[in-house]
Amino acid sequence: MKLSVPGRATGIAAISIAALLTTSAIADAAPARVAAAPDIPVANVKAHLTQLQSIATANGGNRAHGRAGYKASLDYVKARLDAAGFTTAIQQFTSSGRVGYNLIADWPGGDANQVVMAGSHLDSVSSGAGINDNGSGSAAVLEAALTVSRTQYRPTKHLRFAWWGAEELGMVGSRYYVNSLSTANRARISGYLNFDMIGSPNPGYFVYDDNPAIEKTFKDYFTGIGVPTEIETEGDGRSDHAPFKSAGVPVGGLFTGASNSKTAAQAAKWGGTAGTAFDRCYHSSCDTTSNINDTALNRNSDALAYAVWELSK
């Protein structure tokens, strides 16, 4: 999650997102649509975090915009998606004198006039590996996409997944993507779901209150597992849903807290430590694989998948 005031990016090139594949042949051979989202194994999500940590360690301790660690992170995610049958595209831009990249992955099939997107920023700050901020969201979105492939899910709507660059500089990559879309293509996005910091070590369970239908979908999931939620306010407008919302796209998302302190009332209902930040390692060098609450990561990964399945049916 970004801390600074939004910056401005200048695009130097953009690789056009591949045209959506026609669905007729796929529909003929498609298996029956699954009735509900499958469980997302948290061990798989954590395995992606281990890879992102290794990438940061091998590249100066971070995965920041314009640094080798960011491009290596993007290459890792892209390779997994390509092998799983996604149509991927890299979108290039510049910010602060450095080249940045977005990664877009489309799952073949579904109604191209009704696109459900799930995304997260892949970059870290320069001071650390960014495993909670935002390896957690990036890894969960990746594993949800891979689960779509493993189950050969054939939704009614078209599914698109995204990993954004330079969020920490002010949602630069996601803003560049939104601005690159025609008015017609923006209107085709029926919902954008954002996942930024979903494994905080002293977690809360926060739901964006932007689009009512998306908000209700997430709340329904958490109600079903007996976990109370609160409306997200700490990061309001400070992550990659903001450019989509400004463009009129319905948005929603999940968050487990950053530098704000957990109150006594929150600790009573969620556990954890009152008077301590949700993430004491926010934007710090200690944001490593030891800075993750597995229970929060597991619940939010499953909530992510639930929303993708429910909203794309």
Q: What residues fall within each predicted segment?
A:
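Metal-dependent peptidase/peptidase-like ectodomains
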Residues: 164-263
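Structural recognition of the beta-strand scaffold that forms the well-ordered cores
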Residues: 45-53, 89-91, 102-106, 115-119, ...
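Extracytoplasmic/secreted proteins, especially bacterial periplasmic and envelope-associated proteins
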Residues: 44-47, 51, 68-88, 136-143, ...
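His/Asp/Glu-rich mid-to-C-terminal helical/loop segments that flank catalytic regions of hydrolases
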Residues: 261-313
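A non-catalytic alpha/beta surface segment that caps or lines the substrate-entry region
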Residues: 50, 54-108
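Secretory targeting and sorting signals
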Residues: 1-30
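N-terminal capping segment at the start of a domain
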Residues: 32-68, 123-124, 193, 197-200, ...
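Alpha-helical metal-binding/catalytic segments enriched in His/Glu/Asp
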Residues: 105, 118-171, 304
